[in-house]
Amino acid sequence: MRVKTGPTTRRRRKSWLKKAEGAWGINSTSYRNAKQTVMQASKYAYRDRKNKKRDFRKLWIARINAAIRKENYTYSAFMHKLKQKEIAINRKMLSELAIQNPEEFKKFVHSVMLK
């Protein structure tokens, strides 16, 4: 006797359509288009999880650079001094300090650069 796959197929297709719910137009109603849309979205999500790390690092560096240039120093010179003095503070923390407490950041920069 032949095994029919009606319920299985319906369940699988329903699953793809459920994942494509937020898609635009036919991409959320047609099974074939929904599947392609979801697969492409998954690729983008995977790629952008990697890019997110790069983007945040770039953002932190830009913020630190802007804050340091106000004190007439360069980012590269500042980072070099930090490494020389073996001060282990990451860029995320420096960036937050520059935004949240500009006065404290200013004191920190001068203490690193002048000693």
From Swiss-Prot:
<dbReference type="GO" id="GO:1990904">
    <property type="term" value="C:ribonucleoprotein complex"/>
</dbReference>
<dbReference type="GO" id="GO:0000027">
    <property type="term" value="P:ribosomal large subunit assembly"/>
</dbReference>
<keyword id="KW-0687">Ribonucleoprotein</keyword>
<comment type="similarity">
    <text>Belongs to the bacterial ribosomal protein bL20 family.</text>
</comment>
<dbReference type="GO" id="GO:0006412">
    <property type="term" value="P:translation"/>
</dbReference>
<dbReference type="Pfam" id="PF00453">
    <property type="entry name" value="Ribosomal_L20"/>
</dbReference>
<keyword id="KW-0699">rRNA-binding</keyword>
<dbReference type="GO" id="GO:0005840">
    <property type="term" value="C:ribosome"/>
</dbReference>
<keyword id="KW-0689">Ribosomal protein</keyword>
<dbReference type="GO" id="GO:0019843">
    <property type="term" value="F:rRNA binding"/>
</dbReference>
<dbReference type="InterPro" id="IPR049946">
    <property type="entry name" value="RIBOSOMAL_L20_CS"/>
</dbReference>
<dbReference type="GO" id="GO:0003735">
    <property type="term" value="F:structural constituent of ribosome"/>
</dbReference>
<keyword id="KW-0694">RNA-binding</keyword>
<protein>
    <recommendedName>
        <fullName>Large ribosomal subunit protein bL20</fullName>
    </recommendedName>
</protein>
<dbReference type="InterPro" id="IPR005813">
    <property type="entry name" value="Ribosomal_bL20"/>
</dbReference>
<comment type="function">
    <text>Binds directly to 23S ribosomal RNA and is necessary for the in vitro assembly process of the 50S ribosomal subunit. It is not involved in the protein synthesizing functions of that subunit.</text>
</comment>
<dbReference type="InterPro" id="IPR035566">
    <property type="entry name" value="Ribosomal_protein_bL20_C"/>
</dbReference>
